[in-house]
Amino acid sequence: MFDRRSLIKSAAGSMAGAFLAPAFASSVLSPDDKLMPVDTRNGRSGWAKPVKQVIQIKNCRIGEGTPKVIASTMAKTPESFLKLMKEYAEMPELDAIEMRPDYIGELSGKEFADLSREAYKLAGNKPVLMTFRDKTEGGGRHVTDDWYGQFYTEVLNNGAVDWIDIEQFRDISVCREIVKLAKAKGKVAMFSDHEFKWTPSEDEIIRRLLMQEKEGSDILKLAVMAHNTGDALRLMSATWKVRNYYSGKPMLTMAMGRWGVLSRATGEFTGSDLTFAMVGGIPSAPGQIPYKDVKKVMDILHDAMYPKGA
């Protein structure tokens, strides 16, 4: 795992030399990991398909059935944030709620920890995910790695959450401390990576997801920006390969933008176990589908895949 700012500065070099099979033998992923080569047709004899893992948070089983639907609170004041938490808790089509403190003014870790305890009570039986998204990854506020680590530490120690999102390309020592504390507190840790300008190669997508697993991520998350349907299909294919060849961990992958809409509703086909949806016409990322619509589409696809009595 390395710093995102270093990745951006050397993007041309990374794109030229690290995307295909040699990336799996790089210093980031040791050859001892014994990763299987990507075979788009079938597994070779002796290969075992990863055992799919299910994570249960409250009454929500992630990794089982149709992808679970998450909605984000994009509120800009504590009062409107709490109002949204209560409203989302009463929406049966939503399976989980994402708290987004990066949009709520200039709250400190202590201030949000206090606020999160009240918000958590309002969420009822819905799992609560906490995400502080930096502006460099599409969020509302830019903070240093040290500040980020202190914020998460405060919320994990004194706030109320079930599950946290950790930006993959933060300082690795900060990320590891957050993961260590989250697991000690019995919380679900989810590394994430967001590419708001482009879609990496299929093998680079796979590599980044496996980097997350290696660092202890319970759920693997990656979002890319699709500029055409081919970008979306590449993300979907990479997700399928991770699920069928490399990892049984639950995943949350998506291609953003209008060309990536299909990826948000077809996770049961590809291996993505969660999806973000829009409430009230305000998306937290480009290309989100209204929550009732995406739930309906996924249910239709599920029933067609597994017809009753078949």
What are these regions (language model features)?
Residues 87-91, 118, 154, 181, ...:
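A generic secondary-structure signal
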Residues 57-73, 130-139, 182-195:
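N-terminal small/glycine-rich loop or linker at the start of catalytic domains
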Residues 65-67, 93-95, 124-126, 160-162, ...:
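Short, well-ordered coil/turn segments that N-cap beta-strands
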Residues 43-48, 67-79:
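N-terminal glycine-rich anion-binding loop in soluble enzyme alpha/beta folds
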Residues 1, 22-59:
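C-terminal segment of N-terminal export signals and the immediately downstream linker at the start
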